[in-house]
Amino acid sequence: MSADVLTERLFEALINGDRPGARRVIAEQRERGIDAEIIMPDLFWPTYELIDSLHRRDKITNLSYNLATRLLRVLVDQSAAELVATPAPRLNRRVFAACGPSEGLELGAQMAVDLLEANGFDVRFSGGGVPTDEVQALVQQDSPDVLLMFCSSPQDLPSIRQLIDTLHEVGACPNLQLVVGGGVFNRAEGLAEEIGA
């Protein structure tokens, strides 16, 4: 079955809140020997991007969007448990990941950090809604190897940019690797470099 058809089947089940139907799509993939490390980036991620894109363009209702994202989160959580059940060799690289301060949508970030953890990174993930001064304090206190900031909402860009600028200005963690991701950065080529990440 093609990836597009599979994504469409899962999408339809999700936006209709069809929990058994969504689980059936995943169970069929597992029966074919496809594990969570493939399902997450190759099925969950494109389905999530489709849901998010249609919602931003007002092509699906808020109800359908909520049904879809809540159910997809359940499926992602279940798959994440499978990912860490057979841990990868540790890379001795510590990642602190967060979403923007007003970011309520964390599902894409959650998938990314689940995959990082499954691939040997030590990950801490605060999600969204955390003020940037608290993120800065944690980074300065714990000195992670990587600060990974997700942003799908344009209103969070100024806060993330300010955080990055402040970390550079105060010389906090000179070896800190700054990484940004999420919808805003996917839609605006060169934005990550422009803000210093």
What feature does the model see in each segment?
Residues 1-88:
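Long amphipathic alpha-helical segments
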